[in-house]
Amino acid sequence: MTATMYEFHLPQVPSRLTARYHPRSPELQGLGGAWARARLPFSDADDEHDFLQYACLFPCLVWPRATFDRMLDLCDLSSVVSRIDDTLPNPGDVGRSEAHATAFARELGAALSGREVPPGQEPGYASALSDVWGRIAGKAAPGVRERLSVSLHNLFRSFVAEVASRRRGGFTDLADYVELRAHSVGAQLCSAMAEYGIGADLPDSLFTDPEYTRLQAAVAEHLTFVNDLFTFAYERHRGEAMNAVLILCGDGRAALQEAVDTVLGRIEAAELRFTALRDRLLARATAASQVEPYLTALADMLAGNWHWSRTSPRYHGPGFVWNPLTAGTVTLRPGGSTSFTAARHPAS
């Protein structure tokens, strides 16, 4: 990325989805923060403080209809996955080699099996995962438990693939990147967590339906590009390469505004595909199938991730408070923080 890439215009993006918070968000944030503080490793007090600022905001936005007892599990599982994701770009941690990442993924997989967690580089993550997985496995219906387990194992494998890609210098082709991120962005896991949260047990026929397969692809693309739109300043500061905006801007292939506009176009196209496929699936659903509340939960998830990505201190810097503008000028500041102003687009 060149030295001139410090500012871009964010237009008003039309959305057909509405974000909402879980009605017991303050209580969940307190309980989830206490669990994360006790169970997860942090590098220092500042690291812990910064993480606990937003530890449960993401799950409270993306699964707002989950029952309270299951929402506690979702908060804790989300915290584990988020902290693991933070370790991957660190060359002094599990990200220092594909072999280290593979060993770490095996350790995490063992935590899902009920076996004793073996010693490893970050035993805190595996033991925390074992704790929350034990609770989830005891409540989930067999099919839901299997979908959660498969999606977690797939996520761990994608973490290894991400580390391997970083070691090779990252991606230069957007299509290859999107293919990997279809797994590593956690869309499959987030969807299974949505099913668990509302207490559904969906029919197997849904998961073999071609229209549902296409809907899941739209979910993954929406999550990926929304994340990348709002996180690239943060990820650039961390020396990251796993971001669509950074890939499009690499080696001067596109100016920042052009890259942002491309990503915004992909977000809007993914949302249009999602809503069209959702409506077709709803037209065929029966009340007994539980498909309608599940698809509503997926729509909540996309809207919540959009709001979270726009407003989170995780991506915009400690202490960030949203103004709350949804369009205007986004300024990238030294240290990876951002600010939003209502300045007119230079071309307008």
Locations of regions flagged by a protein language model:
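Alpha-helical, largely C-terminal catalytic domains
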Residues: 1-348
